[in-house]
Amino acid sequence: MKHKLIYFQLLLLVIAFHANGQKKGLSDEQLLKGARTNITQPLPQVAGWIDDSHLLLNKKVNPDSPSRVVVLDCKTGKESPGSMDMLKKSTAPSRNIIIKEDDLYLKEGDQPEIRLTQTPDKEINPTRSPDNKYVAFTRKNDLYTINLDTKKETRITSDGSELILNGYASWVYFEEILGRATRYKSFWWSPDSKSIAFMRMDDTKVPVFPIFNENGQHGSLENTRYPKPGDPNPEVKIGMASPESNQVVWADFDASTDQYFGMPYWKPDGKALWVQWMNRGQDNLKVYEVNLSNGSKKEIYDEKQKTWIDLDDQGGRITFLEKSSGFILQSDKDGWENIYLHNLDGTLKNKITNGNFWSNTVVKIDEKNQLVYFTARKENSTRTDFYVASLDGKKIQRLSFGDYTHRVDLSPGGSYFVTIYSNSSTPERLALMDQKGKLVKELGDAKGPEFDQYEMARTEILRVKSEDGLYDLPIRITWPLNYDKSKKYPVMINIYGGPNAGTVRDGWQFSGQQQWWAKEGLIQVAMDHRASGHFGKNGINYMHRSLGQWELKDWITIVKWLRANGADSARIGISGFSYGGYMTCMALTAGADYFTHGLAGGSVVDWKLYDSHYTERFMDTPAENPDGYKTGAVLTYVDKYKGLLRIYHGTMDDNVHMQNSIQLIKRLQENKKHFEFMVYPGGRHGWGGNQSMHSTNENNMFIYKNLLQKEMPKAMLR
């Protein structure tokens, strides 16, 4: 009997071994060409909420099947046929503005298009008023409106030129303050559609930076008004007007003052404009209420910090309470992002949250029940959770669950929410939850039927203690397929690195490219430093007046850990673009004892060469912080360079000028250093098409030649 038992146990081991050994390997076509696998499958798509208890979902039985729209009754959990028309909020004919051949057309319901403009000049950023009666736009840097009922055009400003921009942002405001999503638009309708606010920017004193265009027999120069650290900035005025008047009321600010203005806020009734003001040093933020009739202002809020305050909040700093007199404000002044309740006159009522919250987004304010719903990173800095707090600050509850990153969609009345949740080892799932965070129904799982049938590399989130012992630095690491602890492997680290710009997130990420590199034996790493946002503003403040220093110190600590855990110290690669390119260059120079190979794209190499607003926020001006600019410059450490750096840049980059790479190349040549360099003619701060494929191929060949030390397979070519 004993012998039979031993035989049976051995038989089970053999069966288990063979079953485990029968896992399939992903083919080249699946990894590199997007050929079908059933490792994952589509989740139902949330089309929207019909009302507080009915959700519209777009579902597929399998990837090849047609979509079907269903209505989910959240109270019963039952589904019934639905249609996208159920999301329509109004029966009135829709009014859409169409741009054709640089002119504007009105498309109203099923009616033929009506031409609104016919000029040789472009109409830019057409934006309808909230009541759908007007469209505002800019033309040749002046602000216009058209009454969509009468088709009457009104020119609100008349001094637009190459230097005077009305309703159209100067470059530094577009890039650093208002944001790229605005597409240079700097005008805003009031909620009642009775007024329009705009910024007037005067670029007269802003220095010109010439960008060379190689096209044509003689080439040409594109002259950009681009302020560098210490340079004059655009002079900005805030104007307000009614949509059919050219009588502009100017807010009571002195445009010649060294200052910045952030995204303005209209009060919910449209009767006043709140303007964010900041000093040139970016350590004092004030919010003013501006009177629409005479432009007078009164101070509502005043915040000072020893380091800096971020102005580019994209409209998320202030949220008004519409049914009561007050607003909530988000600030990191106590070292973390917390939420505060204020009266409309600016006086503080109470602090709503008091904890280590970061990356907060207000989802909804429920004034009836005196609640605010928001997402934030708190339980774990690599994950996003969903919370509800009472406006009086006495109660707070986490509504999401588990060790997952959550993306939520709250019902209009706050009775239910759906969440898409995942982590680095769990594909996304979709669930319906009630207002107390209790599971109502699982709605979908992206884990496919063949998930367990394929060999896949292991990805995990780990923490490495900083050298000073103060921080547990997060890394996301994908190990080589069939990783063997007794062997040494090459490493490729992908980074960005800027202040509050972390990249390590604990969510499901699966790509054929990632699995390909793992199959080839490459350790793939994303890593964040103490100032990347995982440790609040207290951690970020380390970078004040010292860009490039703490990032490198913490990353060297992580590289030491990698060396002790399977990394080949002679093949430590790092790659990044923009700020990531800067840190790649720093790693190959100041960190040359630890980083051996680098791919640096669109890189800053000296902070004196970047723009005023971004650089001075962290570094102050070169005159105020000469030592910080010196220690933060790649050029300072070129003599330490000893690995292999591949530099690449777009010739018409209007963000990080190619001047940066040229100055680095010059210094490398002066020091007789070997490096690689590639330019992309006409490329801006990024490029597409064949240039993008060429760039990818060249970078992949660099990895094969220097890290994997073998020829790149033809299957990798794009």
Predicted regions and their residues:
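Serine-hydrolase catalytic core recognition
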Residues: V208, M263-Y265, G270, T405-R718
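Beta-propeller domains
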Residues: M199-K349
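Beta-strand C-termini and the immediately following turn/loop, strongest in propeller blades
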Residues: L56-N62, P93-D103, K107-E108, V135-D142, ...
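Bacterial Sec-dependent N-terminal signal peptides
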Residues: M1-S27
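Predominantly five- to eight-bladed beta-propeller fold
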Residues: C74-L87, I156-W188, S195-W250, G437-P449, ...
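Short glycine-/Asp-/Thr-/Trp-enriched loop segments that recur within the blades
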Residues: R36-Q41, E123-N125, L163-T182, S256-F261, ...
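Short loop/turn segments that connect beta-strands within beta-propeller blades
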Residues: C74-K75, E108-Q111, L148-K151, S242-N246, ...
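Non-catalytic accessory segments flanking enzyme active sites
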Residues: P44-A47, S53, N58-P63, S67-V69, ...
